[in-house]
Amino acid sequence: AADMAMRNENERFTFEFNGETGVIPMEHISYFEIRQRLVTVHYGAGETSKFYASMEQLEERLSGKDFARTHRSFLVHLPYIVKFQRQSLRLRTGEEIPIGITYMQSLKRAFSDYISRLNLYTSENL
């Protein structure tokens, strides 16, 4: 479990936009927002970067990395979620992200799985 945690800390998300390559540590990313194939990645202290991709490409790249779809335009990093509300969720950055009714069940399941894995790793270290 410790190996997995260390590997996750070193993971980077890379992207290209206008001929430049961007690199962001995965743990700094709070969410992705996509509008007509233009993706905005939100990270750090309110920073953003943009690149082109489809939601399907993005979901494929982030598969198994604790990101979940909340809405047709949003993909959220599960460790950033602090509160579920009726039609949105609050991130630890203070931002509010919409939840589409279509994604509610799968989002709650993904979050529950994430919390279970977190508790498993924590209890192994005791």
Where are these regions (language model features)?
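Inter-domain helical "communication" segments and dimerization helices
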Residues: 1-12, 110-126
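A short, terminal or domain-edge coil/loop segment
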Residues: 65, 69-70, 104, 120-126
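DNA major-groove recognition helices of helix-turn-helix
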Residues: 58, 106-107
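Conserved binding/recognition cores within well-folded domains
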Residues: 1-99
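C-terminal structural segments of small proteins and small subunits
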Residues: 98, 105-106
